[in-house]
């Protein structure tokens, strides 16, 4: 149980060989330097999402979020000047879609094969993301992405080109979000200064999770500032209301394969350690 909660790897194996990954049963893809860019696990349910382009459309989910953090943040936004704008409905629909995505996909481990003698669980582990909203980004887009991160229970660092209202900024900081205001030029300088910084040395910084969710219209400058380093993933697609898409940057996929028998006799010890559906 301790090992499963601490180990940092994309594929974990307990009491079995580490070779023989199979589509759906054991989606494959590593963490850290075992992966490049913003891809997802091969053979997993999100594989095609990372290979596709997505355009915003109105979400239809009506689920209610169970996250107190999200509810309190949304209430503060609604009571601020942003709540009086037409695009607040965009934020609310996004929150409902996040809740639906959490209830149906991200909030628990999946074992679709259900072999019985072997458990193959795909689960989602929250990871820190640096959300960058450049000077062209709207407040609604920024908050929609941040709320997706909060719904995923992920640590979020937020860098904005334009400051948000004081009360909204206050609730974000109260929820543990690392908040800063940087011009586009200042942000590029920050990235350039860390273009060659080893990943371990990024611990404790906004780039600790080696993931950037970029909201803006100049993603090329972000890649250039990073010097093309492959171990920092940049998500730059248009902001959507779909929780199934917007929550992905804040979650790392982890496949856990556990032998559930001993000499042919079923052994259910792992069910006390890791649950699945």
What are these language model-derived features?
Residues 1-128, 132-144, 151-277:
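C-terminal segments
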């Amino acid at each position: 149980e301790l090992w499963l909660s601490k180990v940092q790897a994309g594929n974990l194996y307990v009491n079995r060989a580490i070779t023989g990954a199979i589509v759906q049963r054991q989606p494959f893809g590593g963490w850290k330097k075992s992966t490049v860019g913003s891809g997802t696990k091969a053979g997993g349910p999100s594989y095609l999402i990372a290979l596709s382009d997505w355009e915003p459309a109105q979400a239809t989910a009506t689920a209610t979020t169970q996250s107190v953090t999200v509810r309190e943040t949304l209430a503060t936004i609604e009571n601020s000047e942003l709540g009086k704008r037409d695009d607040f409905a965009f934020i609310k629909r996004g929150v409902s879609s996040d809740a639906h995505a959490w209830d149906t996909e991200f909030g628990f481990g999946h074992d679709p094969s259900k072999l019985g003698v072997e458990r193959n669980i795909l689960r989602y582990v929250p990871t820190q993301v640096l959300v960058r909203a450049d000077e062209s980004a709207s407040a609604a887009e920024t908050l929609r992405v941040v709320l997706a991160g909060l719904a995923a229970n992920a640590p979020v660092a937020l860098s904005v080109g334009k400051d948000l209202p004081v009360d909204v900024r206050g609730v974000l900081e109260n929820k543990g979000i690392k908040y800063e205001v940087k011009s586009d030029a200042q942000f590029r300088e920050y990235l350039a200064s860390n273009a060659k910084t080893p990943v371990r040395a990024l611990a404790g910084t906004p780039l600790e999770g080696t993931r950037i969710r970029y909201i803006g219209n100049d993603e090329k400058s972000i890649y250039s500032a990073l010097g093309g380093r492959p171990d920092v993933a940049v998500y730059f697609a248009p902001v959507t209301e779909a929780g199934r898409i917007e929550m992905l940057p804040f979650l790392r996929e982890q496949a856990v394969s556990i032998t559930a028998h001993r000499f042919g006799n079923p052994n259910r010890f792992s069910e006390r350690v890791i649950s699945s559906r």
